Each structure stands twice: as structure tokens, then as C-alpha cells.
Amino acid sequence: MAKKTIRDIDWSGKRALVRVDFNVPLENGQITDDTRIRAALPTIRYLLEHGAAVILMSHLGRPKNKVVESMRLAPVVARLAELLPEAKAVKGSQATTGPAAEAAARDLKPGEVLVLENTRFDPREEANDESMARELAKLGDVYVNDAFGSAHRAHASTEGVARFLPAVAGFLMEAELAALQGALENPARPFVTIIGGAKISDKIGVIENLLGKVDALLIGGGMANTFLLAQGHEMGDSLVEPDSAPIAKSLLDQAAQRGVRLMLPTDVVIADAFSADANRKVVPVGEIPPGWRALDIGPETIRAYTEVITGAQTVIWNGPMGVFELAPFAEGTRAIAQAMANCPGMTIIGGGDSVAAIEQMGLADKIRHISTGGGASLELLEGRILPGVAALNDA
């Protein structure tokens, strides 16, 4: 599904209308992590260097279709100006569409950057309202989507606007699609995926899709408990989803039929309460006493999973192996992060706690691709078409 990119456009004198993902964490009006802003810089710089005026749009937080003062993009504008000294100007607008936004866009000169106000202040954004899409399209000559993290949303700024302008991918979008789709469509083998997180119900579609593609699937986190329950193990007070046990059993059967190694924990770290100072011990999966709960994978499981990961040529990891936010139960997740860093093949991490683990351990530079979109990468792994990608012009 090759898409046109910003390299396919002659930008001289054109206005680039770029959807970016500037949904950064703020505390008291200060940005606490500017990773997402930095991720958009290669695209913005390319456009500026090639003679474009650049108009940026993004959402921030969940303002619920109204103006929320603490969710304005002013702090983002200030940070972007610091990161882009080469821009002739970095301006902010308090409008997203309408006469004020149109005037600001019209006055923008090549080499200058304009950041529109939070797209989600407008109730039409999340409704993918055609009137908003048309108003946004008035602001630019060519639409660029570089917001992979929002590509699974069909909103006015991610999907609707692409119907009314030539529409191409930015560098971040291109890199995300190349890594994730490349791994799914033509992986170097052995191809291994590691799926963690609390609930199997959130990831059934992902596991079903991957069973047709991978050589091995490693399961951890709370979702492993439901698989173990389906195998007949007593799980004590562990988080389980009894309603999903038949699905877990079916997935185990499908894996066996397809010759896929679906690996589950063989030992677990258990605790007598859900807290960092609970009593804890390591037991085989069949020996969890009543009143105790599994909160992490055990050392034997870590060894087995590490061996499979380090021997792989393509690995995708999504979701923690245990209750990563409690230090005594973070070891499994940290060990998988280390195994990923030691793997010589194509390593991809998709979203959330897995990324946090890699960054906390200072291993980010050892991973080939760290996805900026948790929800979007999950939907790609599930085999879904992302609306924000489908809307772009085919190459």
C-alpha cells in the first residue's frame, strides 16, 4: 500500500497543511516530554528547505469539543520555535478554521511556520464533519499527514481534509508504515511477536492476525493468566477474564494447527496483595495458592523468552510482561527490553509501557523502530486499514 510522500511534491511557493501529533504531556503549562514535537522536525525542515510555508495542526488532550484554556497549543508553539531556529518565523493562531485562520495562512511566507489551535476544540473534528474538512483545506495547497499516532482515527484533520487536497505522507508516517507493514508483509525470519498487557479481550484481533504470520508468539502480562486458566491452571486471585477463556483456548488450538509456537509463562512472580510492599515469591504456573496473584513473569520464563527473542530476525513487542508500574514486578518487562536491545534483527516496539521500559533503561538507541502510535500500531497489527493512511494519494 505505497503512498505518495512529501518527496513527490514541488514545494516551491506552496502552503503545506500538515497534520502532526503534538499531543504532548503538560504540567502547569510546561511540556514534560517533547518527543512527539521532535519526531515531526524532519518533515517540517524538509518542507521549509524546499520553499514551502508550513501550516501545522494537531490535537492536544481530550477537551471534549470545547475550548479548554489549559489545552491550548501555545506551549507547543514556544517549544517548536526553540527547536526550529532555521524557520523565519514560528507563529501561533488561536483559530483552527474560519476567517482568522485563513488570513494567517494567506499571510504566511515561504520559510515560515504557523501552528493552528487545538483541532479538538471544534466539535466537528472528531465527527469528521465535511464542513470543517473543507475549511481546513482552504488553508493549504497540499495536505501532509505526519501524525501516525492519530492515523487510526477518521477525523476532519486526519481523513476528511485529504478528500479536498492532494494528500501525501510525511517522513514519520512513511517510517512507521515501512517498519510495521514491512515486518507484517515481508519479515526476515524467524519472526517473533511479544504481546503483553492486562486483558486478552483488547488484543484478540491482534493475536488472530499474527498467528497467520509469525513463527513464535510470546504472551505475558495479565492476559497470560487467561490463557493459563484456559489450560486448566488454578490462578488464585490473579486478574483473569473467564469469559475470554474459550477464546484463549481457541487461539491455543489455532497456533498448534498452524505450527506456531505460542509460548506462555512457565513460572510467575506472585504476591499476596496488589502493592509494591506485598509478600512475593516465584512459583511454577500450576502452583498459585488461593489469595495470591501473578504479577510478573518468572526467571525461567524470562530465560526462555530471551532465547527466542535474541535468535529472531524480526521482533515486534507490544505491552508489558507484568505490573510494570510497581518496581518489584517490573523485572519481566525490563528483561524483555534488554533482550530486544540484544537482538541483532529488525526490532520494533509499539506504544505505551514497552516504550517507557526501553527509555527508562536507556536502550532506545538499540531498537530499530519505536512506534509513536500505540493505538494505530495495534490496529495495523490487527490487519486493519488506517483511515488516515487510506486517505493519502497512492504512489
Curated annotation (Swiss-Prot):
It holds the Pfam family PGK. GO terms for biological process: gluconeogenesis; glycolytic process. It is found in: Cytoplasm. GO terms for cellular component: cytosol. Pathway: Carbohydrate degradation; glycolysis; pyruvate from D-glyceraldehyde 3-phosphate: step 2/5. It catalyses: (2R)-3-phosphoglycerate + ATP = (2R)-3-phospho-glyceroyl phosphate + ADP. InterPro entries: Phosphoglycerate_kinase, Phosphoglycerate_kinase_N, Phosphoglycerate_kinase_sf. Monomer. Belongs to the phosphoglycerate kinase family. This is Phosphoglycerate kinase. The lineage of its organism: Bacteria, Bacillati, Chloroflexota, Chloroflexia, Chloroflexales.
